[in-house]
Amino acid sequence: MKIVSAKFWSEDLELTRPYSIAYETIEAVENIFVYLVLENGTWGIGSGSPAEFITGENIAMSRGVLQNHLETLVINKDIASYEDICQSMSRTLKSAPAARAAIDIALHDAWSRFNQKPLVEILGRSHQSFLTSITIGIKSIQETLSEAIEYVDRGFRILKVKTGASVTEDIELIRKLREAVGDNILIRVDANQGYTSENLVQFSKGTATENVEFIEQPLPNDKDSDMMQVSEEIRIQSAADESLHHPDDAENLAAEPHLFGIYNIKLMKSGGIYPALEIANTAHRSGINLMWGCMDESRISISAALHAALACPATTYLDLDGSLDLARDLVTGGFVLADGYLSVSDAHGLGVKLIEKVTV
């Protein structure tokens, strides 16, 4: 079944709750969208959220790549060859992972809709659902505690807190957060490359009684080797984020002894589902746990990440909250959030429904 039409566009999506991380404040995000139609009318949609501060790709680059390559890549190609197209993109469009992700997700959506199955069933389901964390940006202690209580009251059971500005203040924050939310709420930390190895040891010792589940990307990604200066116990509970983009990165980080015990896969870093599954296979083979994370993204790509996560045996953690603070989106559905758990429906493809019809 051939792909007969392809369209792309971008839209600015404002956040209802701007937030800060270690190096900037985020108030709105511009996402790129790809819409494909097969000759029998079946459609598929994908989205991408370029993160220039992580991958070097901005929205202008995404648009340029799609303008120059989208139709050549997909028009008159058989949707059954979607994996070949994804593999080709990994070689030719390596510098634009969000643009690749938008195409990749649209292909996976169209293929699974064509087969009248949810994407996770096409990929091969390993899990039914997972708890997801919800993220609190860098804020004052009082603001953090207030937001944390709000999220707990909304049913979230895992809080991820951005840190990295001051290890002493971070320790105080985690202690007060634990006191505020009690022992039944899980706490994760994302240092966003803000620590040295000495800071990491100091933070781990200072929060040893607070039951921090793990810490994400504690050191700058050009200082990965410094992780060998900390104990194996700390490394096992550290997650590679900015240090892990491509399948090649996963292979390199899988070398013994492991620098990280957790891989944080984001479709906007990997370039979509196809390369993400390659990373996941490396993790599974190497005994490394998987976390699936995100940028600020449409429900489209969040749903894609969830379908992929539920298909991977090594998946252990979810941090797929990237669409929850969008003031608007282009679709509904795709995932179900209940009592902090994320699951997918039995709808075909990604399970998303267009709010407005796309004209091509």
Set out the residue ranges of the language-model regions.
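N-terminal capping/lid subdomain adjacent to the active-site entrance of alpha/beta enzymes
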Residues: 1-187, 192-194, 201, 205-208, ...
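Structural preference for beta-strand elements that scaffold enzyme active sites
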Residues: 33, 129-133, 157-160, 184-188, ...
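A broad, low-amplitude sensor of folded, mature protein cores
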Residues: 35, 110-111, 136, 212, ...
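Glycine- and other small-residue-rich loops at beta-strand/loop junctions that grip anionic moieties
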Residues: 100, 136, 162-166, 192-193, ...
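Extended hydrophobic secondary-structure segments
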Residues: 186-196, 237-246
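Conserved N-terminal glycine/acidic-rich loop preference
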Residues: 196, 211-212
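Shared catalytic-loop signature of beta/alpha-barrel
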Residues: 211, 222-239, 244-341, 345
